[in-house]
């Protein structure tokens, strides 16, 4: 395991499991009607947040999209702040005004997410420009999905970042679908070919290969930080649930069964567990991590829900 110690592997698993359990808790409780905002879950897409957590630096900044819970948590955002935000409480990370798609925690460098597709891409580039002007040694993570690469502002932003040599990393989570429309129906050539003319260093990660993504993230960060240049990392991934909401929508058959089976065999948590087992990390250790995380997530959500119900009672 090149440059990847057992401790890092455990940290990677902890974050991936933490993100998944946090979102599962949201999904399991969503039908109660106490969360009253549209919610885009990233269950199945935990690789990027888990990798980002290994490079945690509160001085590095991040912006994200409508599907931002994982990025927020991976960057170190407050879990009570997230759950309270979903419940519309003043103690939420956006004061209860933003809901699921408008998260922020500047204390860890998470500068915000928005609901409009591609909206935060130029914001991230602006932050990178400010970092360069202030001669700081930081970078900006700009998280986006494959659908956002079809917006004009994406190309304007990577052009400007390349032209001005700005320290930012565009991390594209490509889950193959924009709502129900697959990639082949929307794009006739791969993104890697489209961006060649912009002179930006490009990396591709496939099949939930976390060791590969760790290495590429390491290279991209060193490059962007030292050379003050942008980079693009495209990560092929898969969302387990519907585009927006807590349910599975596989019965709609817009995703091929072979495609679904292939991805179910590439589950990121199972991938990491296999590597943990190879490195003599016991099932007992893994189960202890799971149990501790389950307790934290469940108790935090329950506390948030109780605050919401108390507030609701007072308003009646």
What is the predicted role of each segment?
Residues 110-306:
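Glycine-rich ThDP/TPP pyrophosphate-binding loop and its adjacent helix/strand module
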Residues 6-10, 19, 23, 45, ...:
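Alpha-helix initiation and N-capping motif
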Residues 24-27, 32-164, 182-192, 197-199:
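Cofactor-binding active-site loop characterized by glycine-rich and histidine/acidic residues
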Residues 1-36, 58, 260, 275-278, ...:
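Cofactor-/ligand-binding subdomain signature composed of acidic, glycine-rich
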Residues 308-316:
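C-terminal intrinsically disordered, low-complexity extensions immediately downstream
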């Amino acid at each position: 395991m090149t440059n990847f110690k057992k401790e890092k592997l455990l940290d990677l698993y902890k974050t991936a499991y933490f993100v998944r359990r946090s979102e599962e808790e949201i999904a399991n409780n969503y039908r109660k009607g106490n969360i009253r905002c549209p919610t885009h879950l990233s269950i199945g897409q935990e690789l990027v947040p888990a990798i980002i957590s290994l490079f945690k630096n509160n001085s590095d900044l991040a912006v994200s999209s409508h599907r931002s819970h994982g990025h927020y948590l991976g960057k170190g955002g407050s879990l009570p702040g997230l759950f309270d935000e979903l419940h519309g409480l003043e103690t939420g990370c956006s004061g209860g005004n933003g809901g699921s798609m408008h998260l922020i925690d500047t204390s860890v460098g998470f500068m915000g997410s928005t609901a409009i597709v591609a909206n935060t891409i130029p914001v991230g580039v602006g932050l990178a420009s400010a970092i360069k002007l202030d001669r700081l040694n930081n970078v900006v993570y700009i998280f986006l999905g494959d659908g956002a690469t079809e917006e004009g502002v994406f190309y304007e932003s990577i052009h400007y970042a390349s032209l001005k040599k700005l320290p930012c990393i565009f991390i594209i989570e490509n889950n193959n679908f924009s709502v129900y429309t697959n990639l082949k129906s929307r794009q006739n050539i791969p993104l890697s070919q489209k961006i060649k003319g912009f002179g930006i260093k490009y990396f591709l990660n496939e099949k939930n290969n976390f060791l590969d993504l760790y290495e590429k993230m390491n290279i991209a960060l060193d490059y962007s930080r030292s050379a003050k240049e942008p980079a693009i990392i495209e990560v092929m991934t898969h969302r387990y649930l519907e585009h927006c909401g807590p349910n599975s929508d596989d019965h709609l058959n817009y995703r091929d069964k072979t495609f679904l089976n292939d991805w179910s065999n590439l589950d990121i948590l199972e991938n990491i567990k296999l590597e943990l087992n190879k490195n003599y990390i016991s099932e007992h250790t893994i189960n202890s991590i799971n149990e501790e995380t389950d307790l934290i997530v469940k108790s935090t959500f329950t506390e948030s829900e109780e605050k919401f119900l108390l507030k609701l009672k007072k308003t009646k």
